[in-house]
Amino acid sequence: YKAFYPGDKVKIYSRTDLSELDGVYTVDSTDDNIDKKTVIVKFKEKLPPMKPEMYVFENITYNPNLTVSGCTFNAIPTRGILCTTDKESEIFGNTFKSVGMPDIYISCDCRDWYESGPCRNMKIHDNTFSKKDPIKFEPICLLKPVKDVHRNVQIYDNIIAE
C-alpha cells in the first residue's frame, strides 16, 4: 500500500524521545517504486535540518476520530482497545471482562510499530472494568526520562469491579 499521497499532511517526531517537531508538512510527491520498503517523499515546505534516521514521519491525513460506546469486551487474549490517534477520542459506556492485556492501551511507539502516534483530547468515562489496572499509557522511547507525549486525556466516573 502507499503510505503517502500528494496533499497528505505529515507530522514529524523524534525517535529518541517522541517529541514533536513544530509544524505540519504537506506531501508534494512520492516515489514508492524503489525496493518495496523505501519511500522517497518530497514536501512542499522546507524541512528543518535533521538526520532522517532520527525521526519518524506520521501521515496524519487519515487519523480518525474515535468513539467506542456500548460494547462488551470479554475473554480477549490481547488488549481490548489500542488507541494511537491524535484526533478526538471518547471511550464510554463499555464493559471489560477477562481481557488478557490492558483493557485500554494508549500507545505511542516510534521504535517498533512506526504508525503509533500520540493521543490528544481523549475522554475515558462511565466504563466498567474487571481488574485494578485497566488502562495503560506507554510511550516507548529510546531515551529516558520521557517527555510529555499524550495530552489532554481525561479519565473519570469509571467503575473498577474486581
Residue ranges and their predicted role:
Residues Y1-I34:
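Ser/Thr/Gly-rich low-complexity blocks that favor extended beta-strand/coil architectures
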Residues N59-N65, F73-A75, L82-T85, F96-K97, ...:
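Low-complexity, polar/charged sequence tracts that form flexible coils or short amphipathic helices
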Residues T95-K132:
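Long amphipathic alpha-helical scaffold regions
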